[in-house]
């Protein structure tokens, strides 16, 4: 550990929501990223450096890397969504897109967007987190190279998940293993050898270290305030350790790398710390006769606002409903929940649902990504910036989203449907997360994997199977209807069904049944209704809404 008391760690968010949970394109290898890093610096006057504009990235991705345009936009927009923007700015962008009548007009608006070039290179590099194989590349260059790994956590500290995006030990190991390559990507071309490698005398610019703050942050003497890496590296007492020269205003790459390796430690606000020392939340009750005990924890009591995490596991056979300040702006993970109805009615930063079965999730607006993995027979209802799914079976998604839903690998029997519910604070929460009702791409998913035909991977819910979802809780707020309304085909189906009910009621009323006949008819209807409640699973939800004796 550095003698100055500085602690550095790898930021969680770039990996939680920035690393696509799918193997990256082969052209995102270090070999090609090095070429891109050199290329953009030679095109500074053409919208490539220090800011990379969408048309330039489209040219690089489609023309040189041979990526599809949709895939090029996906990575560009994913990174842009990680940038700091106000909700008002995001809503303004949604309004601009909603006013575009053609694809050409959309492209014209996108052409004005740009990202930080060096940070975007780092973003592309960390997509290797979910690389399936680390075999030697065709050009004979082993990638990623093996580096000294951080000390493995004890079994008690090790998180109970194999999801690398939610495993901060994987984040730390990835950065430590590939720190030299990350730094070399940030070097100016004249600081590299002909084979794109650094030397002992290579110098990094201040802009390069500022870009590295995308991945690394820290604190001093365990203070609660968190600083980006470049602010700590430029701090006067650390100039010798970080290798900063006042005269040249550059960093010695050799000294900076040594300082980073000496100072990097486990993220004190990451998922592992939350599981180990987070505050336990009594949001769920123990189901009688069940050996499963729900575990819910958060770090809101000790983490800065932008580092909030909530983890929940093994919620079983119950209704869990929360609208809480603890959830606001938090990264939330639900793991191994089954046969439950889970309502998280607060604006969330991100939501990950893993290994859950036979349950319904109703979520407040998700500012970044809603991701599902290895789930079966779920109904998910949410407004989100992006939905991505992998290894799901028989799941239905009622969503409102300004981005095309991503179908990654391993999915079966996926159903997409329009968002069909509301709660009183919904529109207020949407405004806080910068999510609008248009554009809405719920019915236009993007298949990222290459598994079978596109039409066999998903279906759109037929209007004849569509019903409104009612949230059975009272809250304060102004939203009294589904924001943005329903697509016309679904609205028409509801109207026809309602008309059928009116006709049926009129028929019963005009039948002039005797008192005994009415009694028999009522019993028949109640029995059929009860059978319907049981067959649809609604009986379980109604039972779980009744407070247990201990909770009442």
UniProtKB/Swiss-Prot annotation:
Function per UniProt: Plays a role in the regulation of centrosome and Golgi apparatus positioning, with consequences on cell shape and cell migration.
Domain of life, per lineage: Eukaryota
Keyword Endoplasmic reticulum found: no
Chief location of this protein within or outside the cell: cytoplasm
Family to which the UniProt record says this protein belongs: Belongs to the TBCC family.
Domain C-CAP/cofactor C-like: 304-435
Protein name listed in UniProt: TBCC domain-containing protein 1
Cytoplasm as UniProt keyword: yes
Pfam families: TBCC
PANTHER family: TBCC DOMAIN-CONTAINING PROTEIN 1 (PTHR16052:SF0)
Keyword entries, A-Z: Cytoplasm, Cytoskeleton
GO biological process, one term: maintenance of Golgi location
Expressing tissues: Expressed in brain and testis (at protein level).
InterPro entries documented for this protein: C-CAP_CF_C-like, CAP/MinC_C, CAP_C_sf, CARP_motif, TBCC1, Tubulin-bd_cofactor_C_dom
Gene3D superfamilies: 2.160.20.70
Cellular compartment(s): Cytoplasm, Cytoskeleton, Microtubule organizing center, Centrosome; Cytoplasm, Cytoskeleton, Spindle pole
Lineage of the organism: Eukaryota, Metazoa, Chordata, Craniata, Vertebrata
Disulfide bonds: none
GO cellular component terms, semicolon-separated: cytoplasm; spindle pole centrosome
